[in-house]
Amino acid sequence: MSRDFAALRGSQQGPVLLLASGPSAGELCLDAWRDVPVITMNGAIAKLANSAIEPLFYVCSDLSFALQQPELYALGLERARHLALWPEAIEGLSERLRGKAHTLRRAPSTRLEHYLGVEREQAQRARALLSRRARDIGFSRDMDYGIFDVRTVAYIALQLAYHLGFTEIYLAGVDLNAQAQRFYEGGTGPRSPCGLDEHLHNRILPGFKVMQDVMTTEGRQVFNLSRSSRIPAQLIPRADLAVVEGAWLGLRTRQAG
């Protein structure tokens, strides 16, 4: 039987790495992150295949991914401590895997009362009363209330990181470049479809703006480790990957000494 997310709400603190599959994720030095919780998604689990890192969560929001990349999907299911999947995906799991699966569900469609504060504890929405396309853009504070999907799985992972309680969030591989291969895709291997260009300006970036408003108001920080990301640095500040990884390695050395 799958679970809800309530028992894990606020269970974490401090830093977390959100590992996506943009090509910049290939630059990560995993040894630097071995003491930092990791939330990974879709095919980005490939980065951890030859490491000892056990991700806290594996998030897969693409119901076709299991057919497109069955080996990577199976790896994510096995390696992660927890899974965040749609109900249809959970139905296809073994009883053992269902025991660590948490059910993704969509937040309620926007109604006028949502702009009047009735869901203040659960979510924040973009103020777009006159735009049908942007009306259901928001950021969930409670995974069991439901998530907002702006057409990139990294955004679901951000809502999960918030729900869990993390306050220092690092984005790796969130390049949002539809023309670039994912770091795990070879030149002749199968490629999963990508609709980033279609949704970047009308859903993805407006969603990240709502997310950043929530995080900033509550004193949480989000950093982008990708130098080639299409998310403007004014929206999510860049962090120098070498500096961040050097800090983690230095901290471990001091603690060991």
Each model region followed by its residue ranges:
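Metal-ion/cofactor- or nucleotide/acyl-coenzyme-handling active-site neighborhoods
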Residues: 1-257
